Regions:
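A detector of single, family-specific signature residues
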Residues: 1-347
Length: 347
């Protein structure tokens, strides 16, 4: 075989090779969304960008308030909530008395301790320049809220073409209207048509571990950078799913312990990626089989263990609580019950 000269183009040979593979049926078609999916995809992606822009405006509003010495973020969990908006509107309109603005708080923020914290957080050097900046950021946030509400209505209208698939996805923990619409837009109502297994789909979404092995040494297994739109949505759904008592919450806690727990700062992030991978598999199977998801319960992993394994696990936990002591588990009948009869001796 002659060596190829440098600079020689191989396009013709590459095309011939591709044609041979296609003729033999060795090439599979790529995933091409339908026209209906593309419409929903345009809306869901624009909604994601609008939400990100809104978040950036909130951060700029935080910065403007902090530059004036106002520490609302240290008292309020969300400065764009009802109480936060009322106080910011009062600041923009020219109110400078801290106690008057603190009295605008609603709900639990009207408690005596919270009122004192709000008064301290609002006592600052807020000038007309800061008011102008806050007004601009507030108006942009309102525009984003209005745009997001309109997009939600349009997405719900177009995603209503797949009522059966929406009902199936709604049974998956962590899946709501936004996540289900994003799934239908990015992956489609029938993922098994394009992806023969959930593993292939996970690889396409880049929610599978990286396979980086060299000289029999396994290097970092971080996921890829693709799946820009559907991957963050599934991770967001995973954070919501682990808040509900069930198998996914139990699996998350087991994974955090396996990855090092509190000793490893990245244990929770690794575990949440694994939960997102599990959600992808569940959604794939739900749409493939047409059966809604049924949770196996928070004690799923405990039921798989024998009584001896459960006793050994409890003994190890007690040993960690009382180091240096010997832990012995004794099983006795409940009070008032007759003692167990001794086995009869053989004649």
């Amino acid at each position: 075989m002659s060596r190829r000269c440098a600079g020689t183009r191989t396009d013709a040979r590459d095309c011939a090779r591709i044609a041979e593979l296609l003729e033999c049926g060795l090439l599979h078609g790529s995933f091409i969304p339908s026209a209906e999916q593309k419409e929903v995809r345009d809306l869901t992606r624009y909604r994601m960008k609008t939400v990100q822009a809104r978040t950036s405006e909130i951060q700029r509003l935080h910065k403007a308030l902090e530059s004036a010495g106002i520490k609302l973020g240290s008292v309020l969990s969300d400065i764009t909530g009802v109480s936060g908006r009322l106080m910011i509107d009062a600041l923009i309109d020219g109110e400078r008395r801290a106690q008057v603005m603190a009295d605008l708080a609603k709900g639990t923020l009207r408690q005596a301790g919270k009122q004192a914290d709000l008064s301290m957080a609002l006592a600052a050097r807020f000038t007309d320049h800061h008011a102008m900046l806050c007004r601009l950021h507030r108006d942009q946030i309102k525009l984003a809220d209005h745009a997001i509400a309109g997009l939600d209505a349009q997405i719900a209208d177009r995603a209503g073409r797949w009522p059966r698939e929406l009902g199936l996805l709604d049974s998956v923990p962590g899946f709501g209207d936004v996540v289900s619409a994003a799934w239908l837009a990015e992956i489609g109502p029938a993922p098994h048509r394009w992806f023969p297994s959930h593993g292939k789909l996970a690889s396409w979404v880049t929610l599978c571990p990286g396979n980086n092995i060299s000289a029999r040494k396994r290097k970092h297994g971080r996921t890829g950078d693709a799946g820009t739109y559907i991957k963050p949505v599934l991770v967001q759904a995973a954070w919501a799913a682990i808040r509900v008592r069930g198998r996914l919450q139990a699996r998350y806690r087991r994974l955090v312990r396996r990855f090092g727990g509190d000793k490893n700062p990245g244990a929770k992030k690794k575990a949440i990626i694994a939960i997102a991978h599990t959600l992808l598999k569940i959604a794939y199977q739900v749409l493939k089989t047409g059966q809604p998801y049924t949770d196996l319960g928070a004690d799923f992993y405990t039921r798989r263990q024998s009584p001896e394994q459960q006793q050994a696990y409890l003994a190890r936990r007690l040993q960690k609580l009382h180091p240096g002591c010997t832990v012995t588990i004794t099983i006795s009948p409940p009070p008032g019950s007759p003692p167990p009869s001794a086995p009869a001796e053989a004649a």
